[in-house]
Amino acid sequence: MRALAVTGRITQLTRFRFVNCFLVQEQDGLTLVDTALQAAEQILAAAERLGAPIVRIALTHGHGDHVGSLDALKRALGAEVQVLMPEPDAQIHAGERPKTKGGWPKLATAPDVRFEPGVRIGSLEAVASPGHTSGHVSFLDTRDRTLIAGDVFTSYGGVAVSSRLHLRFPFAAMATADPRQNLESARALRALAPSLLLVGHGPAVPGPAVAMERAISRASR
């Protein structure tokens, strides 16, 4: 698993070349955003290298490539870690509403907190960005406006909106439940004027305004 410090406070961890999760440094420890898959040992090792404990796991959405290491991490960390999942996706995992497109693995771990957009998780503000899943959220780091956009956008092979198939990385679009809603979310995220774009699949994109706008334009055709 490749670890790359993308800001002074955020480390991007990449599994299988194109599946990302993020360790965000806070005063009380680390927030892990998403968990990749089959990566618990590597994530724990990365946290150890940073010299801080993982105190919470905040999920952008409930697809398997974002929650795939959750059970193993919860077993390793126990009550020391708080798990937070967007309410609609938590309902799907609990069997309270039907599954949508994409992989929804069976989880032994129930979230400690089901949250709605607008909440603050440490320095991260949860921003509504539904479409890829009904509950999908993004996280804006209020300290420097770094945006963790989950699967609203991808950047593997170039920045793209996950509302339309991108030949170099089609998988996110194939798993998007509502492409039109996802496109509206992409526009809303662009309006936040992030300083850095981080996504679930692909490299970090500094100064992303032009790339986001072009991706939105392509997806709108």
Identify the meaning behind each predicted range.
Residues P98-L107, S162-F171, A219:
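Short glycine/proline- and charge-enriched loop/turn segments
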Residues P206-R221:
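Binuclear metal-ion centers of metallo-dependent hydrolases, dominated by the metallo-beta-lactamase
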Residues Q38, E125-A128, S134-V210:
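Metallo-beta-lactamase
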Residues T31, A58, V83, T146-I148, ...:
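Residue-level marker for buried hydrophobic side chains located in beta-strands
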Residues M1-R49, F139-G150, S155:
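Conserved beta-strand hairpin/beta-sheet module of binuclear metal-dependent hydrolase folds
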Residues Q38-I121:
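Active-site HxH/HxHxD metal-binding segment of metal-dependent hydrolases
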Residues G8-L13, V33-A36, L59-T60, L124-A128, ...:
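Short, flexible loop segments at the rims of nucleotide/cofactor-binding pockets, characterized by
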Residues T14-R17, S129-T133:
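A short catalytic or substrate-binding loop motif that flags glycine-/basic-rich loops and adjacent residues
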